[in-house]
Swiss-Prot record:
Gene responsible for this protein: PGD1
InterPro entries (alphabetical): 6-PGluconate_DH-like_C_sf, 6PGD_dom2, 6PGDH_C, 6PGDH_Gnd/GntZ, 6PGDH_NADP-bd, NAD(P)-bd_dom_sf, Pgluconate_DH
Functional note: Catalyzes the oxidative decarboxylation of 6-phosphogluconate to ribulose 5-phosphate and CO(2), with concomitant reduction of NADP to NADPH.
Gene Ontology CC: chloroplast; chloroplast stroma; cytosol; plastid; secretory vesicle
Protein name: 6-phosphogluconate dehydrogenase, decarboxylating 1, chloroplastic
UniProt-listed Enzyme Commission number(s): 1.1.1.44
NCBIfam families tied to this protein: gnd, PRK09287.1
Protein's organism: Arabidopsis thaliana (Mouse-ear cress)
Pathway per the UniProt entry: Carbohydrate degradation; pentose phosphate pathway; D-ribulose 5-phosphate from D-glucose 6-phosphate (oxidative stage): step 3/3
Active site: K188, E195
Residues annotated as binding substrate: N108, S134, G135, G136, H191, N192, Y196, K266, R293, R458, H464
Coiled coil: none
Lineage: Eukaryota, Viridiplantae, Streptophyta, Embryophyta, Tracheophyta
Main location: plastid
N-acetylmethionine sites (modified residues): M1
Entry keyword set: Acetylation, Chloroplast, Cytoplasm, Gluconate utilization, NADP, Oxidoreductase, Pentose shunt, Plastid
C-alpha cells in the first residue's frame, strides 16, 4: 500500500458513538480507517460517510488490514464494551502493530484496567491512552468533551486531531492532557457521578414544582426555559424544558407522564461512590442520586409499600402542602435551592478528584477540567466557568463551598434552600439530593460537630482513645466505672 493512501488514524467499534466519532474525525479533514467485527457496521459507516459529504473514511474488514492501513506511528481508537472485549480487541490488533504505535480506549473503563493495559502495552513497545468521551451520540458527531490520560507521547501524536474534533468554547477546544495512568478514565468516571447528581437534583426540582406547586408540564417547560437563560443555563436544564413539551403520540397529554419511573444505569455512578468511600471523601449528593436509582428500580415493592402503609393509616400526603402556595415564590425558591445544591454536588466531585490526584500524583488541573466540561459534554453549563475561575484564583482551594464567590451565593440562597427542603418534607416528597447537599453544607460549615460524643462512645466500648480540645495527646477513660461511681 502506498504511503499516500494510508489513513492518518483508525477507529474500531462502530456502534453509535464509534460511528459518529469516526465521521467527526473525517469531517475535520483527517482520513480515517474504520473496522468492526460485525462487518455490516463498516458498510453502514461508509454509506453515512458518502451521504454526509463524501468524507475520507476507509472501511477495513480484518484486524490485519485495519492496522496496516494506518500511517506510522499508528494511532488506533477503540470504542467497544468495557472489560474483556477491550482486551480481546487489543490482542487482535497488537499482533500487527509495531513499537511506537498507540492504542486509545475511548470507552467508560475502570481506571485500574487502563493502568494494567498501559503496563502491558509498554512491554510490547506500544503507547496507550485511556480517553473519556462525553457528549453522547450528538457530542461524538459534532464535538465531544475529551479526557485523555496515559502516555503523553500518545496524546502528542494525535493532539492536532483531538483539538479539531473536540467541542469548541471561547477559551479553546474541550480537550486537554489529563495526566498519567488511568487519570483520563477516572476523571470521566467522576464527571458521570456529577452527572448523576445533576439529574437527581433536577428531578427533585420537578417533583416539588409539580406536586407541591401543582404546575403543569406546559408551565414547567416555560420555567426551565427561563432558568436556562440564567445561572442554571446548562445542557440538562435545556433538554428538560424540551422533554416537558413533547406530546404522547399514543394518547392525550405529554409523554413524560407516561414513562415508567425506573431509572437505568451503566455503573460509573456506583464506581464514583465506591471510590469516594475508598478515599474517605464525603460525596452524599452523588451517593443519594445512586440510591434513588436503586430505589426507583423497586417499582413493584414501592407500589406494595404504598398500599400497605395506606392500609396502616398513613394519609396520602404527597402534594398536600399545595393549598395556599405562592407559586411565583416557590419557583424562585426551587431555582435557588437547585443552584445551591448543585454547588455542593460539584464540590464533592472536585474533592474526590483532588484526593485521587494526591494519592496517584497525577497533578490534575481542576480549573482546566472545568474548562473542558464547558462544551460537548452532558454536564456542560455556564456554571463551569465559575468553577474554572475559582480554581484559577486558588489552585489549592479546599472546597468550592469556601471559594469567596460561591460562599457568598450559598449564603444568599440558604433561606430559600431551607424553605424548599422543609416544604418537601412536610408534603411527603423525598428530595434526597437537596437534603444531602444541605446537610453537607451545614456539616462542613460548622466549626464544632457532635462527633465528640461518637468518639466518647468508641472509647467506651472499644478503648479507641480520643483527643482533647484543651491539651495534646491520646486519652482513654473508664467511662462505665466513672459513671456508676458518680451516679
Amino acid at each position: 500500500m502506498e504511503s499516500a493512501a494510508l489513513s492518518r488514524i483508525g477507529l474500531a467499534g462502530l456502534a453509535v458513538m464509534g460511528q459518529n466519532l469516526a465521521l467527526n474525525i473525517a469531517e475535520k479533514g483527517f482520513p480515517i480507517s474504520v473496522y468492526n467485527r460485525t462487518t455490516s457496521k463498516v458498510d453502514e459507516t461508509l454509506d453515512r460517510a458518502a451521504v454526509e459529504g463524501n468524507l475520507p473514511v476507509s472501511g477495513q474488514y480484518s484486524p490485519r488490514d485495519f492496522v496496516l492501513s494506518i500511517q506510522r506511528p499508528r494511532s488506533l481508537i477503540i470504542l467497544v464494551k468495557a472489560g474483556a472485549p477491550v482486551d480481546q480487541t487489543i490482542d487482535a490488533f497488537s499482533e500487527y502493530m509495531e513499537p511506537g504505535d498507540c492504542i486509545i480506549d475511548g470507552g467508560n473503563e475502570w481506571y485500574q484496567n487502563t493502568e494494567r493495559r498501559i503496563s502491558e502495552a509498554e512491554q510490547k513497545g506500544l503507547l496507550y491512552l485511556g480517553m473519556g468521551v462525553s457528549g453522547g451520540e450528538e457530542g461524538a458527531r459534532n464535538g465531544p468533551s475529551l479526557m485523555p490520560g496515559g502516555s503523553f507521547q500518545a496524546y502528542d501524536n494525535i493532539k492536532d486531531i483531538l483539538e479539531k474534533v473536540a467541542a469548541q468554547v471561547e477559551d479553546g477546544p474541550c480537550v486537554t492532557y489529563i495526566g498519567e495512568g488511568g487519570s483520563g478514565n477516572f476523571v470521566k468516571m467522576v464527571h458521570n457521578g456529577i452527572e448523576y447528581g445533576d439529574m437527581q437534583l433536577i428531578s427533585e426540582a420537578y417533583d416539588v414544582l409539580k406536586n407541591v406547586g401543582g404546575l403543569s408540564n406546559e408551565e414547567l417547560a416555560e420555567i426551565f426555559t427561563e432558568w436556562n437563560s440564567g445561572e442554571l443555563e446548562s445542557f440538562l436544564v435545556e433538554i428538560t424544558s424540551d422533554i416537558f413539551r413533547v406530546k404522547d403520540e399514543f394518547g392525550d397529554g405529554e409523554l413524560v407522564d407516561k414513562i415508567l419511573d425506573k431509572t437505568g444505569m451503566k455503573g460509573t455512578g456506583k464506581w464514583t461512590v465506591q471510590q469516594a468511600a475508598e478515599l474517605s471523601v464525603a460525596a452524599p449528593t452523588i451517593a443519594a442520586s445512586l440510591d434513588c436509582r436503586y430505589l426507583s428500580g423497586l417499582k413493584d415493592e414501592r407500589e406494595n409499600a404504598a398500599k400497605v402503609l395506606r392500609e396502616a393509616g398513613l394519609k396520602e400526603e404527597i402534594g398536600s402542602a399545595s393549598s395556599g402556595i405562592d407559586k411565583k415564590r416557590l419557583v424562585d425558591d426551587v431555582r435557588q435551592a437547585l443552584y445551591a445544591s448543585k454547588i455542593c454536588s460539584y464540590a464533592q466531585g472536585m474533592n474526590l478528584l483532588r484526593a485521587k490526584s494526591l494519592e496517584k500524583s497525577w497533578n490534575l488541573n481542576f480549573g482546566e477540567l472545568a474548562r473542558i466540561w464547558k462544551g460537548g459534554c452532558i454536564i456542560r453549563a455556564v456554571f463551569l466557568d465559575r468553577i474554572k475561575k475559582a480554581y484559577q484564583r486558588n489552585p489549592d482551594l479546599a472546597s468550592l463551598v469556601v471559594d469567596p464567590e460561591f460562599a457568598k451565593e450559598m449564603v444568599q440562597r440558604q433561606a430559600a434552600w431551607r424553605r424548599v427542603v422543609g416544604l418537601a418534607v412536610s408534603a411527603g416528597i423525598s428530595t434526597p439530593g437537596m437534603c444531602a447537599s444541605l446537610a453537607y453544607f451545614d456539616t462542613y460549615r460548622r466549626a464544632r460537630l457532635p462527633a465528640n460524643l461518637v468518639q466518647a462512645q468508641r472509647d467506651l466500648f472499644g478503648a479507641h482513645t480520643y483527643e482533647r480540645t484543651d491539651r495534646p495527646g491520646a486519652y482513654h477513660t473508664e467511662w462505665t466505672k466513672l459513671a456508676r461511681k458518680n451516679h
